[in-house]
């Protein structure tokens, strides 16, 4: 994706740098946690590494959802005439209410997915606990997903390209005009292409 659209690479890595660094550190923490959790016969030691494993799984799931929420709202950047891109936001600006809601949707969906996998691969107490958490995560996913959809329809401003799409030449964002400031714009695609409604309906 980044090779096809280098502008996307430039904006995302400059704007989401701290967020991506947090994801990277969390992903590094997971294999370390699995390796060192059983190194000592101590309940406190194991509990500490259990929390490390939790952080290593929770942070990437949350931040990936937060990133998607910010993409839906629009990322604050500007493009110079010489095609230089400047990000004008900050890390804490990414943690806005709608983006955090999208982060929670991501966490709930991944917990549901992980719980379903454990139910299939284990039995006994582990499978029973995974089933209980999977049901809770599924209910949370449905509720949070619905709330996010209502906000996208009524509150969050969408974006729509109003200029002609030239598919026979190189991409130049300076030649495009975008309409924003109208809530529900993201749902216009469902009206233009009704078959796309199958995607959210199928989950």
Name each model feature, range by range.
Residues 1-36:
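Membrane helical hairpin/interfacial module
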Residues 36-203:
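Long, contiguous internal "core" modules enriched in hydrophobic/ aromatic residues
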